[in-house]
Structure formats: C-alpha cells, structure tokens
C-alpha cells in the first residue's frame, strides 16, 4: 500500500526536489541577464544585497539572485558553471539540511553558493572539513570566486598563531577543520582578556563529510588538558604482570577446570578478570611488595591499582599493533577505525594510551587533567544553523535527524550512475579469501582495468601486498604508514592496470580520475610549452578511453565494514560523473563482522558447506551480512545517544560557566558582581553556623567568629554583642556579618588606585572560576566512571548521575563564591603593574596544556548491557557520627578544611 502511495505522490525526497526545482528554474532564468553585466556591475551586487538585508529583506528572497551571482562569478574566474543539481545542493545546504551527493559531483563548488549567501549578513560562515589539507585546498580553489565578489576568505589550520587565527575568523568565509574550530572555542573560554579571544559569532556552518564528523567522531570529545602526576612506574609494572594472565575463551564456562584468568567482550572492547584472575594478580602484587599480605584489590584504597590493571589488560588483549594503532617516531599513533587514517595528537582515555605506550616500550606520557572539553555533538549545537555534505548519509538519516535535527536530502546525479555492483563472495577462511582477491586482480589488470582494494586494517593491506609481490603484480599501498604519499598515490589510482591498496577510506576527499589526474601531470611539468600540454592531454585521452573500455575503476572490498555507510563510501570511489565502474566485496566467515555479530550456527553451517577454495554468492547471505551490520550500527548509535545524554548534563553546566565567565571578561568593572557575591557568601557563611529559623541553643557563634577571622580577616565578637543585647535576632546578626564583610572590603581598597583594584578583582574572579571548574570536571569524571555501580542498588545510573552532577555543580558554585571573596579579603591588592605581572605568571603556568581529540571508550557504554541485568540489592550506607561542618578539618586527614576537600565530591 505504501509503495502504491509513493508511486502516485512520490517520496518526501522526490517531492522536495520537485519543489526546489522551481527555484532552480528562477535562477536559470536570471542567467542571461547576469551574463550581460560587466565585472564591476557583478561585483557591486554584494553591496546591493547587503543594503537590501539592512532594509529588512530576508536571505530566502535574495537566494535566486545571490546564486545566479555566484554561478556567473564561477564562470568568469574558474571557468566552472554550477549545474542544476549543484544549485539544488546549495539550496539544501542553505536550508540547514544534509545534501547527499555522489563522489565527483562537485561538493566543493556547491558550498560556494550557501557560503556566499549567508556571508551577506556579515556574521561569518564556517566551512568545515576533516583535515588541514582539504581546508587549505578548498579555500585556495574557491577563493577566486569569493574575492571577485568582494568576500574575504580565511583558513584555520593547526600551526597558526592567535593573531592569525583572529584575522581568519574576521573574514566573511572561514575554512578549517572541525578540531580547530572546537579547540578555538575552548581556548576562547580560557582567555583572560577579551582581546585574546579569536572567534566571533557561530552563525552558520557547512560541514563537509558530515557523516564522518557528526557520527564517526561523535564519541571522541575535544579536550584541553594539563599534565597530572607521573604514573609510568605503575603502568610498567602491570604491563609486566598482565602477560602472565591466561585468556578464557568465553564469559561462562561449564566447570572450574575451564576457568582462566580473564575474558574479553569484543563488542564493547572491554576485558574482565575472573575470580581466579583476581586471586592470581593479587598474589603477584604481594610478591612485588605492592600489596600487603592482608590486603586485597577490592579495597577502596586500591581503586587506582585496578585502574592501571584494567588499562593494561585491555591494551594487551584488545588492541593490536598495525590494526588499532602504529608506532611512529617512538610514539603511539591511533588508527581511525572508520577511515584507516593515522590520527596524530589523538589519545585514548582511561589510561589506555599509557598502557599501550608501556606495552610497546615507548615513553609513557603522563595522564592529563581535563581543563576544558566538549563533544562535537554539543559544539555544533552552538551554531545558529548547520548544514552538511557527504556522499553517504542516507543510511544514517535517522541519527542525523534525531540528534542534530538535520534532514537528509539525496541530490540526483548530473549524469546517470552506471556502476555495476557484484554480489559478495564468501569464503571459509581469510587465506582463501585473499587468494581469490589476488586472482581477481590478476584477471582485471590483464585487460587494463585499474583496481582499488579497500582493507579494514594496515595488517590486512600488508598481507595482501605480500601476496601480490609473490605474484609479481605491481601495486601501491596507501595506509597510515604511507600517509605522506596519499595525494600522489590517489592521483595515479585511475591509470590503466594500476593496483592500489588503501585502508578503508584513506584518500577520501580526492577524486580518482580514469586515466590518471591530468591536472597533476601538467603541474609536474617544468615550464611546459603549449605543445607539451597538448601532448599530455592527448595521451591522457587515450588512457581515459582505454580504462572506460576495460570497465572503469574496479573497487574490491577485502571485508565488510561494521557500517554500511563505510562500504558505500568505498563503492562510491568508482563510476564518478557517469563513468563506468564496478564494485565487489570478498568476505570470510572469520572476518570480525561475521565472527562477532553473525550467529554461531550460521557460521558453522557455511563453513561445513564450503570445500577448500569454494565460495558463496547467494542473496540470502546478503541478508545475513545486512542483519549483522544493522546490529553493529544500532549498537554504535545507542552508544552515541548514551554519550550525548550524559554529556548534556555537563553541557548545561558548561553553558552556565562560560556565559558567566564571558560576562566577567567583558565587564569593565566587576565591583557590582562582587557586591552581589559578597551578599550570597555572607548568607551562606552565616547559615553554616546559625541554621535558618533555629533556636539560640543551636547557634554556633563562636565557630562563626573563627570563620570570619580565618577566612575574611574580620574581628567581630558576635557572642559579646548578643550577650549585651539578647533582643538581637537571627536577621540582625546576619546583617552585622554582611556589613562587616562589606566594610572590610571598602576599608581595604579606599586608599588604592581604582584601576588596579578593578583589574585585580576581574583577574581573581576569572582565576578562581577556572580553578573550580577544572576541579569540577575532574569530580564529574570520577562520578561518571563509577555511576554504573548504582545499578546494583536498583537505581537508574543516569538519573543518579544527573542528580549528583547537579549537587556537585551547586557545591562548586558555592565554593567558588566563598573562596573568591575570602582570597580578596586575605590578599594585599597591589599596583596595576604587579597585577599584570601576576596575571602573566598565571597564564604562563597554564601554557603547558594540550589540545587533544581524545578517543574515548566510555565506561558507561561498556556497562550498558550490564545495566539491563538484575543487580543485587545493597544496603545503603548511612553516616556514622556527627555531621562535618564546612569549616571543620576534613576527616580524611588532608589538613584542608572540609569545604575545600571532600565537601566537593560528596
């Protein structure tokens, strides 16, 4: 019935394309008129549109003329004319949607349309790509169009200084990577002067490869951190002990004889000790002198040892060299599981990175303390409008809409797509699969067809390379180890009988042109004559035709990825712009996808039915594979959704802190802010010792006097005042405390330079807020890592997390207010020059910070399945002894006051 309705009225996508096609017709009708304009008249259009906007016209009304302007500028500056389907793509992007456009359809050119239109508001447009190379390339390619129309273009890359960044952000259109935009946002919220901030408003963002950025990288927060204590000795110790532990093949075993020391969950990438394993590691630690004879790992004071142990256990049992990471220049470099690219600068969290450094014998870098962090999910929600482009988004349409509110529109291709997708072939073993791939390659190159082989890991690419060498088949390998050669290898990939092996989507963002890349060949010539160029073009045309006759580029996948989208990205490298092409995937029942997610009975039946070298290529196996991929995609979606639910709690708090901080930063005079804080602190302090509405017998006036003296340098004999006049009530005493704090500050500052006082007050506010926010993030991390244990007490961990995170936040704000007033009361306010010097020293102490895109495997995600299991009831712990007041010594024995120690985390 549904298909019948769709045939009559069309799908939503078809109806949308039909609707915007009317706008395209209007743009096309303007083309003859704009062709008649002189260059100066065309350039003047930008000023005209901005005037019309200032007079109340809206962008949607300007769209046809603005797009016609950009199209004409493209023809005059780049000899490139936007096709109708590219105009549709531009409209989709302007409307804040995701445009799915096939490889080779000109997404870079499409972005110029909405970028120009939205830059007319003078609020800035950010065009976001996945790496520095693409950001610089796209900005350079399109800058002629923008600059012709009077628009300035900037590029944000990793090696820019703050002034260069500020200038780039001031441009009408700014290109850059998702990481750089995110880190600049965090750094701006750590600045101590307004002039140090580089970004302006986050108005409109166009995200290239939107699926990669908003989905693949959604679990990896951007983190700015500073080094914490060195723990390399403990990592080295556990790295030495873990190899003595034996792996148990599955979680449940039938008898004790089969029990080993630990088992792994490959889906969640976690490892768990058995009771036997706990006993074994405890004995080893006692022999090493790390544990006392009567001690055990379950003790609360050994929680850090468990942290090191779990990290090293996962490093040895779940993370493999040349699959999950490589060692480059004596450093561990993560391999992105979706793209196969090396990700320098990215680090795993939870001590995993340090554990792998210990495993590989390289320098162990200290774990870091988080100073600021944000996920891409919440960073991009800061923009007024976002849009995205990619070749593969339809399979992730539900997630893009449910989390980001982005609708996916599939844009028709300019020319019909004629790629031939063959059935998958499934073999019994990995070796048989690779042998079949080699034979297929051999057959295809014999007729001059170029082949691109996509592998899921560096290890697989090197195994395949070894087999091809044995057969004396020339080939290029493109993986994280050869990343420097990426552009040149991809440029050659379309040559006749050329074989290229690439891990996943290495080289994504660069078109593979049949016959080779003509522009690259011409660029490599030194002082070419017109005759040289003509000869190169003639040779290229011959190669291009030869490759087309051979069937175009053939894509061979050495295994299916966890996500259908990644498979589609690989397929999408072939048959660009109406060219011929083919794709085929080879699988084995030992591949991770089928081994982990397909049913065991199915795998056994398939293996039994296949004799050596035989394969299956039936339709029902496609259903099995699709079902397995669906399981993985659903699992990863749940993880990302779960991450967002937890991060939203911190995000709400982050917004409050950053808005408050910005108000401090922008204020010329913070004395009114401090006056309000002093009132809050006076009330807070008073009620710590005089409970609201309580009888006199419960008042602790002596304690209040001591707190005023120790924390605010105020001598106030409240007990004597009350004895002299017992009519003094609670409100009278509170007023006396409030006035005493206010008078003390006025007296302290009355003879000082007001400029120095104001500057010092602002600096103190910012410094104190930053310190407390940083400590709060650490407390939140600890809470997050332990909150799943609440499930064993029959409590919902998420609700408990929200409740306790709010309590932590409220306590942090109270402590911030209290300590900033206390510190201002104690510190001698000095000259303006000394204040500036103190500020500079503080900023220098903050200079040893790192901006990292951390690969997080969240403990909350690992225990998602555990949360569903019935947990045993546990007895609630009740406080023994009297309540500890905020100004009492902390019972932990640290020597600090309770308010400055464990009050923050209780």
Swiss-Prot record:
<dbReference type="Pfam" id="PF01043">
    <property type="entry name" value="SecA_PP_bind"/>
</dbReference>
<dbReference type="InterPro" id="IPR036670">
    <property type="entry name" value="SecA_X-link_sf"/>
</dbReference>
<feature type="binding site">
    <location>
        <position position="892"/>
    </location>
    <ligand>
        <name>Zn(2+)</name>
    </ligand>
</feature>
<dbReference type="Pfam" id="PF07517">
    <property type="entry name" value="SecA_DEAD"/>
</dbReference>
<feature type="compositionally biased region" description="Basic residues">
    <location>
        <begin position="896"/>
        <end position="906"/>
    </location>
</feature>
<keyword id="KW-0653">Protein transport</keyword>
<keyword id="KW-0813">Transport</keyword>
<keyword id="KW-0547">Nucleotide-binding</keyword>
<feature type="compositionally biased region" description="Basic and acidic residues">
    <location>
        <begin position="853"/>
        <end position="865"/>
    </location>
</feature>
<dbReference type="InterPro" id="IPR011130">
    <property type="entry name" value="SecA_preprotein_X-link_dom"/>
</dbReference>
<dbReference type="GO" id="GO:0008564">
    <property type="term" value="F:protein-exporting ATPase activity"/>
</dbReference>
<dbReference type="InterPro" id="IPR014018">
    <property type="entry name" value="SecA_motor_DEAD"/>
</dbReference>
<comment type="subunit">
    <text>Monomer and homodimer. Part of the essential Sec protein translocation apparatus which comprises SecA, SecYEG and auxiliary proteins SecDF-YajC and YidC.</text>
</comment>
<dbReference type="GO" id="GO:0065002">
    <property type="term" value="P:intracellular protein transmembrane transport"/>
</dbReference>
<keyword id="KW-0997">Cell inner membrane</keyword>
<protein>
    <recommendedName>
        <fullName>Protein translocase subunit SecA</fullName>
        <ecNumber>7.4.2.8</ecNumber>
    </recommendedName>
</protein>
<dbReference type="InterPro" id="IPR027417">
    <property type="entry name" value="P-loop_NTPase"/>
</dbReference>
<feature type="binding site">
    <location>
        <position position="86"/>
    </location>
    <ligand>
        <name>ATP</name>
    </ligand>
</feature>
<comment type="function">
    <text>Part of the Sec protein translocase complex. Interacts with the SecYEG preprotein conducting channel. Has a central role in coupling the hydrolysis of ATP to the transfer of proteins into and across the cell membrane, serving both as a receptor for the preprotein-SecB complex and as an ATP-driven molecular motor driving the stepwise translocation of polypeptide chains across the membrane.</text>
</comment>
<feature type="compositionally biased region" description="Basic and acidic residues">
    <location>
        <begin position="877"/>
        <end position="888"/>
    </location>
</feature>
<feature type="binding site">
    <location>
        <position position="890"/>
    </location>
    <ligand>
        <name>Zn(2+)</name>
    </ligand>
</feature>
<keyword id="KW-0472">Membrane</keyword>
<dbReference type="GO" id="GO:0043952">
    <property type="term" value="P:protein transport by the Sec complex"/>
</dbReference>
<feature type="binding site">
    <location>
        <position position="901"/>
    </location>
    <ligand>
        <name>Zn(2+)</name>
    </ligand>
</feature>
<dbReference type="InterPro" id="IPR020937">
    <property type="entry name" value="SecA_CS"/>
</dbReference>
<dbReference type="InterPro" id="IPR011115">
    <property type="entry name" value="SecA_DEAD"/>
</dbReference>
<feature type="binding site">
    <location>
        <position position="511"/>
    </location>
    <ligand>
        <name>ATP</name>
    </ligand>
</feature>
<dbReference type="GO" id="GO:0005829">
    <property type="term" value="C:cytosol"/>
</dbReference>
<dbReference type="GO" id="GO:0005524">
    <property type="term" value="F:ATP binding"/>
</dbReference>
<dbReference type="InterPro" id="IPR001650">
    <property type="entry name" value="Helicase_C-like"/>
</dbReference>
<dbReference type="InterPro" id="IPR044722">
    <property type="entry name" value="SecA_SF2_C"/>
</dbReference>
<feature type="binding site">
    <location>
        <begin position="104"/>
        <end position="108"/>
    </location>
    <ligand>
        <name>ATP</name>
    </ligand>
</feature>
<feature type="binding site">
    <location>
        <position position="902"/>
    </location>
    <ligand>
        <name>Zn(2+)</name>
    </ligand>
</feature>
<dbReference type="InterPro" id="IPR000185">
    <property type="entry name" value="SecA"/>
</dbReference>
<keyword id="KW-1278">Translocase</keyword>
<feature type="region of interest" description="Disordered">
    <location>
        <begin position="853"/>
        <end position="906"/>
    </location>
</feature>
<keyword id="KW-0067">ATP-binding</keyword>
<dbReference type="GO" id="GO:0006605">
    <property type="term" value="P:protein targeting"/>
</dbReference>
<dbReference type="Pfam" id="PF02810">
    <property type="entry name" value="SEC-C"/>
</dbReference>
<dbReference type="GO" id="GO:0031522">
    <property type="term" value="C:cell envelope Sec protein transport complex"/>
</dbReference>
<dbReference type="GO" id="GO:0017038">
    <property type="term" value="P:protein import"/>
</dbReference>
<keyword id="KW-1003">Cell membrane</keyword>
């Amino acid at each position: 019935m549904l298909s019948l309705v769709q045939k009559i009225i069309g799908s939503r996508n078809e109806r949308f394309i039909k609707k915007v096609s009317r706008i395209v017709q209007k743009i096309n009708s303007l083309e003859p008129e704009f062709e008649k304009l002189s260059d100066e008249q065309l350039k003047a259009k930008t000023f005209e549109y901005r005037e019309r906007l200032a007079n109340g016209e809206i962008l949607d009304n300007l769209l046809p003329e603005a797009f016609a302007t950009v199209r004409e500028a493209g023809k005059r500056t780049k000899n490139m004319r936007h096709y109708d389907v590219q105009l549709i793509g531009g409209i989709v992007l302007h409307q804040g949607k995701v445009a799915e456009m096939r490889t080779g359809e000109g997404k870079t050119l499409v972005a110029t349309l909405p970028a120009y239109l939205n830059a007319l508001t003078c609020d800035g447009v950010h065009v976001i790509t996945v790496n520095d190379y693409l950001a610089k390339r796209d900005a350079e390619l399109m800058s002629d169009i923008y600059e012709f129309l009077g628009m300035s273009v900037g590029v944000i890359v990793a090696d820019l200084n703050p002034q260069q960044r500020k200038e780039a952000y001031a441009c009408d259109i700014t290109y850059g990577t998702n990481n750089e935009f995110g880190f600049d946002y965090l750094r701006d919220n750590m600045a101590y002067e307004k002039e140090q901030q580089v970004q302006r408003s986050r108005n409109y963002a166009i995200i290239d490869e939107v699926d990669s950025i908003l989905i693949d990288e959604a679990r990896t927060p951007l983190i700015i951190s500073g080094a914490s204590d060195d723990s390399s000795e403990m990592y080295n110790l556990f790295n030495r002990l873990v190899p003595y532990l034996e792996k148990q093949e599955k979680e449940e075993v039938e008898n004790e004889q089969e029990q080993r020391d630990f088992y792994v969950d490959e889906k969640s990438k976690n490892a768990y000790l058995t009771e036997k394993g706990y006993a074994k590691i405890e004995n080893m630690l006692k022999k090493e002198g790390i544990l006392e004879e009567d001690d055990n790992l379950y003790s609360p004071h050994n929680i850090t040892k468990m942290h090191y142990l779990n990290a090293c256990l996962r490093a040895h049992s779940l993370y493999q060299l040349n699959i999950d990471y490589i060692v480059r220049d004596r450093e561990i470099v993560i391999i992105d599981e979706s793209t196969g690219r090396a990700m320098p600068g990215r680090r795993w969290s939870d001590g995993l990175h340090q554990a792998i450094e210990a495993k590989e014998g390289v320098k162990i870098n200290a774990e870091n303390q988080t100073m600021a962090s944000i996920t891409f999910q919440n960073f991009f929600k800061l923009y007024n409008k976002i849009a995205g482009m990619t070749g593969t988004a339809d399979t992730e349409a539900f997630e893009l809409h449910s989390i980001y509110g982005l609708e996916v529109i599939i844009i028709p291709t300019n020319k019909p797509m004629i790629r031939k997708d063959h059935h998958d072939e499934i073999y019994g073993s990995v070796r048989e699969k690779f042998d079949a791939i080699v034979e297929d390659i051999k057959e295809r190159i014999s007729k001059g067809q170029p082949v691109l082989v996509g592998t899921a890991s560096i290890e697989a690419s090197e195994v395949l390379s070894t087999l091809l060498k044995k057969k004396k088949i020339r080939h290029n390998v493109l993986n994280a180890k050869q990343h420097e050669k990426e552009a040149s290898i991809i440029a050659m990939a379309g040559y006749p009988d050329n074989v290229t092996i690439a891990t996943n989507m290495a080289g994504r963002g660069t078109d593979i042109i049949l016959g080779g890349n003509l522009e690259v060949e011409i660029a490599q010539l030194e002082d070419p004559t017109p005759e040289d160029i003509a000869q190169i073009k003639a040779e290229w045309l011959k190669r291009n035709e030869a490759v087309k006759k051979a069937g175009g580029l053939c894509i061979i996948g050495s295994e299916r990825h966890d996500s259908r989208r990644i498979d589609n990205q690989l397929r999408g490298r072939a048959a660009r712009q109406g060219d011929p092409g083919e794709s085929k995937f080879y699988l084995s029942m030992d591949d991770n996808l089928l081994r982990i997610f397909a049913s065991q009975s199915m795998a056994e039946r398939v293996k039994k039915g296949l004799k050596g070298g035989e394969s299956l290529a039936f339709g029902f196996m496609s259903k099995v594979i699709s079902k397995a991929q669906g399981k993985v995609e659903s699992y990863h979606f749940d993880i990302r959704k779960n991450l967002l639910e937890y991060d939203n709690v911190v995000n709400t708090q982050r917004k409050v802190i950053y808005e408050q901080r910005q108000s401090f930063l922008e204020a010329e005079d913070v004395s009114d802010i401090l006056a309000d804080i002093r009132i809050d602190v006076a009330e807070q302090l008073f009620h710590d010792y005089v409970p609201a509405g309580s009888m006199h017998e419960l008042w602790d006036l002596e304690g209040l006097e001591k707190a005023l003296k120790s924390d605010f340098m105020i001598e106030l004999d409240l007990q004597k005042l009350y004895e002299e006049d017992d009519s003094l009530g609670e409100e009278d005493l509170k007023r006396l405390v409030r006035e005493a704090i206010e008078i003390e500050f006025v007296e302290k500052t009355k003879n000082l330079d007001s400029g120095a006082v104001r500057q010092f007050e602002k600096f103190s506010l910012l410094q104190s807020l930053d310190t407390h926010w940083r400590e709060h993030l650490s407390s939140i991390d600890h809470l997050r890592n332990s909150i799943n244990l609440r499930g064993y007490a029959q409590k919902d961990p998420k609700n408990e997390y929200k409740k306790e995170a709010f309590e932590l936040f409220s306590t942090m704000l109270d402590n911030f207010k209290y300590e900033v007033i206390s510190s201002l009361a104690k510190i001698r306010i000095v000259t303006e020059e000394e204040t500036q010097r103190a500020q500079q020293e503080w900023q220098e102490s903050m200079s040893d910070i790192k901006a990292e895109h951390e690969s997080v495997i969240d403990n909350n995600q690992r225990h998602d399945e555990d949360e569903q299991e019935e947990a045993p009831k546990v007895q609630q712990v009740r406080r023994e002894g009297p309540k500890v007041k905020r100004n009492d010594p902390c019972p932990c024995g640290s020597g600090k006051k309770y308010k400055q120690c464990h009050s923050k985390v209780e």
